[in-house]
Amino acid sequence: MKILLTSDTWTPTVNGVVTSATTMKRELESRGHEVRVLTLSQNSHTYAEHDVTYLGSLDAGRVYPGARLRGPALHGALRELARWSPDVVHSQCEFSTFSPARYLARAAGAPLIHTYHTVYEDYTHYFSPSRCMGRRLAALFTRSICNRCDAVIAPTPKIRSLLLGYGVQCPVQVLPTGLELTRFAVPRDDALRRRLHLPDDKKVLLYLGRLAKEKDISTIISFMPDLPDAVLLVVGDGPEHSALAQLVQHLQLADRVIFTGMVPPGDVPHYYALADAFVSASASEAQGLTYLEALAAGLPLLCRDDPCLNNLVQQGQNGYVWQNPAQLVRLSHTLLCRDDPDVLRKNAVASARPYSSAAFAAAAEQLYRREILRKTQQRQILQREVVLW
């Protein structure tokens, strides 16, 4: 098959959408498919490099940190992709590259598949002064996007239920993003531990991801005074970095909360390997790829209760979910004082196995073939009706 993936972001940007899309591309190519990508450039120039077409874009950081919007006059680049005539178009984002994805799918007579990666109602603080109004706008926007597609992929049952509640009418299939699991099986890097000044006599809690308001990292930092035998390693960057650093100074935790900033994607497994547990206070995850990465690295989870964790965390077996700060403190002590950390690690690795990148691509391939067949049948029925008329 000829498969076009469209995404507003691409490498070297590091986020869940890029991780999912690059994993998809790599695995589909390994199965013999021809895969191209349509994304935004980081400037106003439109160009192509190998199998990736970059559309000129404009800075939209005032709307959302790091965001860009598609520029005008892109017909030449789209005509070239239309001549290539993909068998299926798989959109990953709802904004700048969604309209080109629709155009190219129509031009090729191909099905348009869309993966819903982001729970926009959890991001209302970026675009609406009222959370209630923001939720209504998010539902309206999501419905208008998804109902223009032939099928929608939801990474978890949580997202499928959300979409159906919004009134999405097209077929919605649950398909968790997969990971290259063996990538996270790396030994602990003692030299890296020393460079980060992590004390040998303390347990290491890890948060890895964007530093943004919806991730509620301040809750994790605020409970660190109750865990004197642990340090918190915060890997990543984002718009909340400055506010979180100020909170650390206010709580006098500079020696027990370590910020690394952004790290190269290839180094990420080594940061997981430094930790004893992965901690998160986010309730805005569509799937939570970092949760899967942590499990693949053998880290038990210590995460805020969220429907995306259903069937992923077995309480006390591969981690714990918590519902309030008091529970977080109590369960942190429970986890870090367990006398069977090797059992926790073994259970964590085992629970990540069903989420392999190979299984992810195989399921996507099956969905593509089904939608291509359905599109072909619809076209044949329409042609027969025209002849009869």
What residues fall within each predicted segment?
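Aromatic "clamp/platform" in nucleotide-sugar-dependent glycosyltransferases that forms part
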Residues: A283
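N-terminal subdomain of nucleotide-sugar transferases
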Residues: M1-Y54, A359, E365, V386-W389
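Conserved acidic donor-binding segment of nucleotide-sugar-dependent glycosyltransferases
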Residues: Q315-A326, T334-D339
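Short alpha-helical donor nucleotide-sugar binding micro-motif in glycosyltransferases
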Residues: C146, M262-V263, H270-A275
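Donor nucleotide-sugar binding/catalytic pocket of nucleotide-sugar-dependent glycosyltransferases
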Residues: T39, T53-G56, R135, A139-R188, ...
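Short hydrophobic beta-strand element within catalytic cores of glycosyltransferases
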Residues: P300-C303
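A short helix/loop element that forms part of the nucleotide-sugar donor recognition site in Leloir-type
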Residues: A185-L198
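A conserved mid-protein helix/loop that constitutes part of the nucleotide-sugar donor-binding site
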Residues: T19, K203-D226, P239-A245
